[in-house]
Regions:
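Acidic, low-complexity/disordered tracts enriched in E/D and polar residues
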Residues: 1-43
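Long, charge-rich, low-complexity alpha-helical segments
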Residues: 31-88
Length: 88
């Protein structure tokens, strides 16, 4: 899968928000926020092909977590991103 184009990740007061750059990408009823790990993952894969294994390896390289936790978090992140329509 790949991140959809037209989004910018912004940090505002320690929070990470994904902003649509065009009117058709903006849903004013739903704000897409990321925690630090999700923001890191987005920055690493933005515009590139990736899968759950890619995210798992990125988490293992950046954070001190077990492989089991990294896999679980990677899969949950992908599911969240699919649900809000920012990957395809």
């Amino acid at each position: 899968m790949k991140t959809k184009q037209g989004f910018r990740l912004r940090e505002l007061g320690g929070d990470y928000i994904l902003i649509g750059e065009s009117a058709e990408l903006v849903n004013f009823n739903h704000l897409i926020t990321f925690n630090e790990a999700a923001a890191y993952l987005w920055q690493q894969v933005e515009g590139k092909e990736f899968d759950a294994e890619t995210l798992t390896q990125l988490l293992l390289a950046e954070y001190e977590v077990s492989e089991e936790i990294a896999r679980r978090d990677a899969q949950a992140t992908i599911e969240d991103w699919k649900e809000v329509g920012i990957v395809g």
